[in-house]
Regions:
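Structured adenosyl-cofactor binding patch, chiefly the S-adenosyl-L-methionine
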Residues: 84-134
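A short beta-to-alpha transition loop/helix N-cap that caps and shapes the active-site region
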Residues: 8-10, 133-134
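S-adenosyl-L-methionine/SAH cofactor-binding core of RNA-modifying enzymes
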Residues: 12-79
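Short, small-residue-biased leader/transition segments that mark boundaries at the very start
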Residues: 1-6
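Mobile beta-alpha loop/short-helix "lid" or hinge segments that flank ligand
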Residues: 8, 79, 83-86
Length: 134
């Protein structure tokens, strides 16, 4: 499951990778236009509080590359970008007048929904006790 993440600093990349560097595919882009050029007409879901569609609605097909863009916690994705993605903008339902979830929680929720739609390929589906048997 390749991850493409846009970070603003080297420090953010190192913090996000922790001890999983051998499992990450980090790609760097100059800006959003650079990302679009290098990823041959990608289907992008824009995760935003401004969206009309709930994150669980898309099919996230098994054979499609799924790109989900999240904005900064403080500002979100610029509206100039969102204008071109009305149908693929998605949101996590929230109670009215309640601040949105933090970015890491939002990424986890949406990423696992995509993985669920795609059958959790390559994921361990069963756990086991360490000191006892079921």
């Amino acid at each position: 499951f390749p991850y493409t993440t846009l970070f603003r600093s080297e420090k953010m990349i190192k913090r996000a990778g922790l001890d999983y560097w051998d499992k990450l595919d980090v790609r760097t882009y100059i800006n959003f236009e650079d990302f679009l050029e290098k990823n041959n007409d990608p289907k992008i879901y824009m995760a935003t509080t401004k969206a009309k569609h709930v994150y669980s609605a898309p099919a996230y097909e098994d054979d499609e590359d799924v790109y989900i863009m999240f904005g900064k916690e403080s500002a979100g994705i610029p509206e100039e970008i969102l204008l071109n993605y009305e149908e693929t903008s998605i949101r996590i339902p929230m109670l009215p007048h309640i601040r949105s979830l933090n970015l890491s929680n939002s990424v986890a929720i949406v990423a696992y929904e995509v993985l669920r739609h795609q059958g959790f390929k390559a994921f361990q589906m069963e756990g086991q006790l360490h000191h006892y048997k079921w």
